[in-house]
Structure formats: C-alpha cells, structure tokens
C-alpha cells in the first residue's frame, strides 16, 4: 500500500521522521498544558490575567535562549545528542511545575521549560531537514509539525479526564506531573535514530565550529534578520491563540471545561492537517508564496473569529481553519530556515531565528493580558494577532526562495564560514 511521500522514505529517513514527530508531539503536550489550566491557576493560586500572560512570556523568552543555545551546541556535539537532552529537559521541568506553590515558582519553572522546548524545536527541525532528500524535504519536515497537534490533543484530552477524578485545586498538579512521560522517547532515539550524515561529513571536514556571530556575517545577516522577524510574527500570533483561546472560550463564550475541549478539538484537528497542506504546496509553488498565502488566510480568519459577531456553528468551523493555517505557517519555517545556512552554522541559525521569534513574539500574549484589563478579551486578542501577522508578511517578502535546495551545495559555496572556524 502506497502512502504518498512516506512510502518513498528510506529506513533512516522514516526513523528520523518519527523521532522528530514524537519530540514535537510530546513536548507540545507538556507546553500546551499551561494554557489549558490558566483558569484553574487563577482560581486556586490567585494569579491575575496579566500574570498569566507573564507565564506565557517566560516560556517564550526561555525558548528564545534555548533555541539559539541548543543550536550552537548542536553545531558542536551533534544534532542527535542535543535532541535527546532537550526532550529530557522539557519533561523534567513540566513535572517540577506540579509542585509550584506560587506565581513566582511557576514563572521560574516555565522559563526553564521554555529553554528545552525552544531547543528541541530548532534541533529537530534541522535534523529532519538534513536527513530527508531535497525533493521531499518540504512535505516531510512540515509534517513533523503535525506532531504539535497530536501533543495538544493529548493535553486537551487529559484535562477532562483528570478533572473528573480530582478537584480543581489538585487537578492541574496531576496534569503537570504526567508531563514526565515524554522522557521515554529518549530510549527510542538513542537506539534507532542515526546522526545526520551531512553533519558528520561537515564535522570531519572542519572539526572546529565557526563563532556564534557567523550567522550575522556577510550575506547571512539579511537572511537572519528577515527569518527572525517572520518567526516573530508567526509565533506572536500563534501564542495569542494558544495562550488565551481556552480562557476566551470559557470566559467570553461561557463554555465549560468539557464544552471548550470540543471547540479546541476542532482547532487541533486543523493543526494536524495544516502542515500536510503547506508541505505539499511549498514543494510546488515555493516557500515564500506559500507563507504569504497562509498569512493572508490566517489574518482574515482571526479577524472574523474574534472581531465579528458569529454564531456557535460558525465558531466551530473557524476553529478548524485557525488551527490549519497556524499549523501550516509554523511547519513551513522548519525546512525554510534550514535551507538558508551551511551545515556548520545551520542549527545555530535556525535556533536563533526560531528562538528569537518566540522571544520577541512573547510580548504579544503578554500585551493581550495587559490590554484585556480595560478591553474585551476578544478585541485584545484580535488586534495583537493581526499586527503580528502583518509583520510576518512583510518579512516573507524579503526572504529568498529556497525550495528544493541541495544542502551540500550550500556547504560548497560557503568557504568564508570555514575560514571563520579557523580563527
């Protein structure tokens, strides 16, 4: 039975795909728990809406630091080792959140959890982009992002189950304690997944890694700035919805935990299919045009969802497209950013752009929390998200087209990077 691009993958490509897919999925389960339990944290720990926004910001700042830091490390000790480390890191600090007794405790743990998640996303994206051949890279690397939807679905599914067995004051702690489970994935990665052959070849050719500032040198500066700005817009808009949508459904639309889970299920279903559509489209019309198309679609969808009067049935449909368009945008950054840099600085470049986008974009959900004190939550969410998507669209205009790029040719055309490594 033929399964499209999956049937065309080799054994190592398939194992790498599942390792990266699983890493995204299980880390997603851990990180999305926070947005789901914000109402419980407000009720049981007494945190305010602005403080809830600061929790989201702390994770994104941590992801910014962790993305670049893990990227720098992956360019030096290997993609596979860092991937394992980041998965364990996220699982551990999600578990520690179960024992928090105050807002300040949660803030610290959330920051540290973000370090691992930012690193895993960056390094996993580089690994799958290097292992898969150019003709399939867009579809396969983008499909890894669908793991995020799976992880989100698991956390949403766990919430009503945990709530039915435990009171609200304890339920959120149990949910965080379950976040230790992704650590099991590391045993699979250690046993079955090979290191990137492109990385191994580059490491043999030059054992010394270039300095951290190499991604800002020469022609890489323009790529780094444009990619980081686009990432800022995409993640800023996404985290408005991830952080505040559960609260919006329960406070503005007056849904119960069970009722809001149904709405979120449609959002998650869209997030599962969006990356598959983007990957197929980007391998045909190119990365840039695909980004611009989905940014326009998402901006229109968000405007209708949050700023226009719509009935319950329409809201369910819009939830699906909200997840689909956002999943598509997030997935496209994995192959695109990997195709901008030579192997010796690929992980640090992708780590900075993805992590920087999360960090700079962290002001967006925090701004929602501040604006929501004096404005309707939907208005605050919609205005902030639309500004973020506008920034991403402008940045996409500046990026070069990279679809189908041979990563070996990038290495051959970047002798200056190797000279930097010698200093």
Ranges and model annotations:
Residues 1-29:
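Cytosolic juxtamembrane N-terminal segment immediately preceding the first transmembrane helix
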Residues 65-101:
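Conserved MFS/SLC helix-loop-helix module at the cytosolic interface between two early adjacent transmembrane helices
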Residues 109-146:
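Cytoplasmic helix-loop-helix junction between adjacent transmembrane helices
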Residues 138-163, 354-364:
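Glycine-rich segments within core transmembrane alpha-helices of 12-TM secondary carriers
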Residues 88-101, 296-310:
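C-terminal ends and interior cores of transmembrane alpha-helices
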Residues 35-65, 258-259:
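Extracellular/periplasmic helix-loop-helix junction of adjacent transmembrane segments
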Residues 46, 78, 99-105, 133, ...:
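Helix-breaking motifs and short loop linkers at transmembrane-helix boundaries and internal kinks
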Residues 35, 220-272:
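Extracytoplasmic gate region of multi-pass secondary transporters
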């Amino acid at each position: 039975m033929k399964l499209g691009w999956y049937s065309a993958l080799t054994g190592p490509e398939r194992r790498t795909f599942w390792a990266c897919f699983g890493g995204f999925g299980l880390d997603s389960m851990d990180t999305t728990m926070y947005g789901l339990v914000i109402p419980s944290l407000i009720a049981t720990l007494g945190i305010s809406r602005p403080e809830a926004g600061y929790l989201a910001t702390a994770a994104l700042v941590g992801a910014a630091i962790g993305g670049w830091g893990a990227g720098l490390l992956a360019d030096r000790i290997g993609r596979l080792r860092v991937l394992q480390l980041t998965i364990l890191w996220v699982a551990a600090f999600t578990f520690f959140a179960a024992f928090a007794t105050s807002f300040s405790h949660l803030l610290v743990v959330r920051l540290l959890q973000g370090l691992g998640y930012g690193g895993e996303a960056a390094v996993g994206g580089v690994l799958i982009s290097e292992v898969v051949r150019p003709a399939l890279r867009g579809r396969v690397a983008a499909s890894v992002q669908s793991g995020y939807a799976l992880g989100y679905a698991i956390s949403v599914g766990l919430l009503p189950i945990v709530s039915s067995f435990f009171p609200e004051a304890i339920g959120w702690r149990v949910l965080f304690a379950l976040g230790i489970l992704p650590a099991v994935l590391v045993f699979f990665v250690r046993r079955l997944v090979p290191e990137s052959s492109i990385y191994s070849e580059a490491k043999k050719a030059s054992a010394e890694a270039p300095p951290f500032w190499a991604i800002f040198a020469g022609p890489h500066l323009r790529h780094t700035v444009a990619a980081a700005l686009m990432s800022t817009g995409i993640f800023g808009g996404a985290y408005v919805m991830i952080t505040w949508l559960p609260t919006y459904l329960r406070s503005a639309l007056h849904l119960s935990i069970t009722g809001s889970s149904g709405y979120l299920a449609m959002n998650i279903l869209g997030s599962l299919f969006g990356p598959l559509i983007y990957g197929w489209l980007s391998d045909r019309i190119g990365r840039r045009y695909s980004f611009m198309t989905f940014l326009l679609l998402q901006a229109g969808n968000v405007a209708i969802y949050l700023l226009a009067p719509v009935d319950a049935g329409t809201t369910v449909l819009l939830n699906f497209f909200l997840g689909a368009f956002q999943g598509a945008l997030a997935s496209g950054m994995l192959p695109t950013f990997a195709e901008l840099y030579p192997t010796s600085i690929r992980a640090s470049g992708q780590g900075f752009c993805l992590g920087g986008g999360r960090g700079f974009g962290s002001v967006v959900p925090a701004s929602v929390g501040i604006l929501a004190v004096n404005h309707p939550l939907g208005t605050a969410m919609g205005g902030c998200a639309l500004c973020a998507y506008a920034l991403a669209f402008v940045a996409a205009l500046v990026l070069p087209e990279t679809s189908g790029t041979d990563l070996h040719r990038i290495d051959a055309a970047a002798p200056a990077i190797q000279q930097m490594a010698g200093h």
